[in-house]
């Protein structure tokens, strides 16, 4: 369970906090030619290794990063403006599925160095973070089709 939480935290940090919107736009525009796609994949690998903190997990982290690259590559090639929501949700579902599978398959080779208190704290931090940044990004993305209709530009900028 704790490995799943670590991998989920690594994913959320890498996909939401450490990936600027400019990178997402560059990936959509330049597809496989975007250096941002490769940097994003490398960040996933590094953050996963830092959070798991076990060198024997390097093969699994490589697998996660490689599948993340392929999934993001498919997404940028096949999504269109009208299908962005569907591809975003499918992309996230694929990433979470990979995390679940890796957490299950790798349990026999990964040893956690954290005591129980730290496991609880890590779970709590991951849960709280999930409720802030990633969930708000998902909600904003899902309701984006209606925000342009309800926007009122008669206010102060950034107010």
Language-model segment annotations:
Residues 13, 17, 47-51, 67-78, ...:
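Alpha-helical membrane-inserting segments
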Residues 90-107, 119-140:
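Alpha-helical transmembrane segments of multi-pass integral membrane proteins
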Residues 70-93:
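Membrane-interface helix-loop-helix junctions at boundaries between adjacent transmembrane segments
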Residues 7, 11, 36-40, 60, ...:
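Alpha-helical transmembrane segments of multi-pass membrane proteins, especially transporters
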Residues 31-55, 62, 88-103:
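Multi-pass membrane catalytic core of lipid/isoprenoid biosynthesis enzymes
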Residues 1-5, 46-61, 103-123:
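Helix-coil boundary and interhelical linker segments in multi-pass alpha-helical membrane proteins
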Residues 16-30, 71, 75-79, 135-159:
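Cytosolic, membrane-interface loops and tails of multi-pass inner-membrane proteins
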Residues 2-21, 71-73, 122-136:
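Hydrophobic, membrane-facing alpha-helical anchors
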């Amino acid at each position: 369970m704790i490995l799943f939480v670590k991998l989920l935290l690594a994913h959320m940090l890498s996909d939401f906090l450490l990936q600027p919107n400019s990178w997402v736009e560059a990936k959509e525009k330049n597809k496989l030619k975007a250096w941002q796609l490769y940097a994003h994949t490398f960040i996933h690998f590094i953050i996963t290794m830092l959070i798991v903190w076990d060198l024997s997990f390097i093969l699994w982290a490589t697998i996660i990063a490689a599948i993340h690259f392929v999934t993001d590559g498919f997404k940028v090639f096949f999504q269109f403006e009208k299908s962005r929501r569907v591809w975003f949700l499918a992309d996230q579902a694929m990433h979470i599925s990979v995390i679940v599978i890796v957490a299950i398959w790798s349990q026999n080779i990964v040893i956690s160095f954290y005591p129980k208190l730290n496991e609880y704290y890590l779970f709590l931090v991951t849960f709280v973070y999930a409720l802030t940044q990633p969930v708000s990004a998902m909600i904003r993305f899902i309701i984006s089709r209606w925000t342009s209709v309800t926007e009122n530009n008669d206010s102060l900028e950034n107010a």
